[in-house]
Swiss-Prot record:
It catalyses: 2 oxidized [cytochrome P450] + NADPH = 2 reduced [cytochrome P450] + NADP(+) + H(+); an organic molecule + reduced [NADPH--hemoprotein reductase] + O2 = an alcohol + oxidized [NADPH--hemoprotein reductase] + H2O + H(+); dodecanoate + reduced [NADPH--hemoprotein reductase] + O2 = 5-hydroxydodecanoate + oxidized [NADPH--hemoprotein reductase] + H2O + H(+); tetradecanoate + reduced [NADPH--hemoprotein reductase] + O2 = 7-hydroxytetradecanoate + oxidized [NADPH--hemoprotein reductase] + H2O + H(+). Its EC number is 1.14.14.1, 1.6.2.4. One of its GO terms (molecular function) is NADPH-hemoprotein reductase activity. Its cofactor is FAD; FMN; heme. GO terms for cellular component: cytosol. This is Self-sufficient cytochrome P450 monooxygenase CYP505E5. Heme binds at C405. In the N-terminal section; belongs to the cytochrome P450 family. Pfam families: FAD_binding_1, Flavodoxin_1, NAD_binding_1, p450.
Amino acid sequence: MKDAERIPGPKPLPVVGNLLDIDPEHGLQSIIAFADKYGPLFQITINGEKQIFATSQALVDELCDESRFHKAVVTGLEVLRLLAHDGLFTAYHGERGWGIAHRILVPAFGPLRIRNMLDDMSDVAQQLCLKWARQGGSTSINITEDFTRLTLDTIALCTMGFRLNSFYNNETMHPFVQSMLYVLKEADVQANLPGIANSIRVSAQRRMHKNIEAMRTMARGIIQERRKNKNPVDDILNTLLNGRDPVTGEGMSDDSIIDNVITFLIAGHETTSGLLSFTFYFLIQHPHILKKAQEEVDETVGLAQISAQHLAELPYIDAILKESLRLMPTAPGFAVTPKKTEVLGGKWMINAGQPVNVLLPACLRDQSVFGPDADEFHPERMLAENFSKLPPNSWKPFGNGERGCIGRAFAWQEAQLVVAMILQTFDLVPDDPSYQLRIKETLTIKPDGFRIRALLRRGQTATGLSRRSMLVARDGSSGESSNHLAEARGDHAPARGQPVSFFYGSNSGTCKALAHQLASNMMSRGYTTQKLAPLDNAVGNLPRDQPVIILTTTYDGQPTDDAKKFVAWLETGNVPSLQGISYAVFGCGHHDWTQTFYRIPILIDDLMHKAGATRLAPRGAANAAVSDLFSDLEAWEETSLLPALRENFLPSNSTDFDPLNPHQIQLSLSKPRRVDLHKGLIEAKVTAVRVLTSPDTPEKRHLEFCFQGDTSLRPGDHLNILPVNPPSTVSRVLAQFNLAPDYNITVNSFNTLGLPQATPVSASELFSSYVELCQPATRNNLKALIAATQSDPDKQELNRLYDSYEFIVRDKRVSVLDLLEQFPSISLPIAAFISMLPALRVRTYSLSMAPSFKPSHSSLTFSVINEPAWRGSGQHLGVASNYLASLTSGSIFYFSPRPAKESFHLPKDPSNTPIIMICAGSGLAPFLSFIQDRMVLKQQYKPLAKAFLFFGCRGRSLDDLYHEELSEFEAAGVVEIRRAYSKTPDFDIAKGCRYVQHRLVTEGQAILSLWSQNATIYVCGSTNMAKGVEAVLQNMLGPLPKERYVTEIF
């Protein structure tokens, strides 16, 4: 272009370019100063590379046109790829890993999912408020540090279910934050130094890599912890681990998961903490605005727990946050590059691949947009009625288009909540009234050295605040996250009425959920759902004999992924006449996207009408920024849609809406198929669970349950428990054979596993409920694996295992699955794998509650096996114990009674036969039922012979099971207890004894006395413990006849 103008800027020096023009501590402010001098577009040279900056709304509006420009990863962000690689924030344009992650994660950040995170956000925000309240109003608060703690804890808890508990360490920031701050600062430094200078900064490079590894190690630990979780929650981390890309069908690699966990932890807290810090700086600097904001919170919320509906009714708080981000965008810029050579602003030529930096602190103060007072803090300019009038792309603190921040809704809800909660609770004053704002720069910006004091408002106290938060926690959710899927009672079969078709456009799942809800409501009114599908399914396929309801939204000004074909079809102008089609449109949007608010719903509505379709009802709308989407849908349904349908399409069986029976569907329940494989199983419902041990001790649990029917159980008897395999083990199998959990497997031949023939079974159900996955491989299994091995070295190693089978495979419990993972060259069909697995068997546990103690109830006391595998790598998870540990109150499981051997029951004459019970750890279970049965006899005033319990464990505060309950039984005269503590033998009641064998020696006289009275001795525990006990007693008592010395070894 001959008339293209040279881009202005300071003259660069040889070698160093403009490096000397940049303040190393305040580089951003130096660059902003260039904007004042050189105008809306300027360039500087750093490290021999030209850097262009745009500083006006008009230029930014051009640069945000995704048909011409796409994101560029430059300077500090490019250095940050050492940490996060192709994570959402640092990926190059078009990177495949970014595409997979983006498509998987966008639905997980939909408005309904974000709203359901409000309770966890409130939990952390309450921790902050309690800390400030307990410190008192005279304490100087480093607000930026506390907001960093808050936002880091919030993102970790809400997206990954991981508690960092940063507020419990007030001395230092979390190690992740310390590493992050160094990496962000160093990335900025490296980006502004010549390559040769960076190459000689050996110590800084080494420290950089050390901090990167520390952050990746923490992310890896979070992932590993989740994979151990037997009941993972449906959160963002679960989506990362298990989500599938709808385009490629692939999941995310482990490296990509780590990259994006780190991206969330950084991007999810760093910018939000800066936003909150600047917001409160501005509020304290403008007391009249602070007062007005506080009045809005008082009028809307009062002292109630803040709900999602409250947040939608705080427009002034919303405006304050927008204005704070306008003046101090905490992520101060983003870069784009043209897809081909472009002319910018009508006069500057930008070559393809040349990055252009959008300098937000300058753009967002453009006086041509925000007026002569653009440098001043005026939230009123950001109220909805003014915000909607701004020119396109005037406010871009969250980036642009498909590379914009997908966590925007999360950050905004969190910021609204925290501002509202703090204003609800405190009056704020500056710690130093003379403080002048200083900016701390890394790749983001925050106030430096800003401190406040927080004084409790309206007579509130720290104790009262604590009590209020506990009441909220006890009473349940404060958020508007009600379950919109009402319970189906199935009292009546559905009648066939007027059919209705529903089509939706949905990226995040919100409009899809609304469509399902509306279809459910319509069914309850006598209509029949004919179709419920994405809009693209409606191309050339709109029915004419029934109403068509469309629910959709706009995504970055464009149709959602599943509505693009439909909109393109309407826009061609070649659509056949839609005459005879009756339709209604319901649109969702967010008023912050002023230029594209409801664009696609309006477009569809207009184009269908122009093509001859009949508009049944006025278009419905829901603004996600200020309302509850489901409530808006319901209101439109009642006031617009239903009246139109009744007038034009009255269903043949029209009924009134019954909220207790919304679906009017008929259903039946049956027991799981796996239950039919075992005779005599009884259904049980868990009524109570608790952990009996301290966190740093191998876990033991108590599980109480109720059941119906007579089982003829007696103290000392057993239960056969029908378990399922640990989810983490099942996931290993699915990954090994590249199966999704809901893949169907159909067995078409007879099998010994009891699998249904010619009936599809999901892969997760098959491997969870029907087969043993951790059984040691047999010799025949090894032969088959050797034959299926492609690698000669692997074949040799497998032959070595075969030759040493007993010691390496059998004794170390190496399974077929372990071998498949260890030797990837084995090519084993899944049918062959299944044929190698034995059927899943029941596991036996002792009762720990006497049937007479609480009729129709019982309990189990068990150790949860989660220990390093004997094979030398990985974890060994006990199948049944981990299954039982996953159950919660209300859970259903299945058992069958199994009598103990006759001698392992209480004496037939309890009044004349003393008993001595000896056990360690969970071996206490049967003896607890013995003692309870004796307690019942005691309460019936029946005489009892003496009973001694010798119980061994690690220590009083570690795993002294049922200490309080046993003490009560002892006080009632039912039993005398003698303890041994292996870790704390000097504890008074242990009498210096580490093991029960030692305690038997100290009580020798009492044992001899009881033995002479024809006592029965019962022993329950491990083989080693039982051998030690037997040796002591034989030495003390002589021969031990089996009718008087009864053991149960596990």
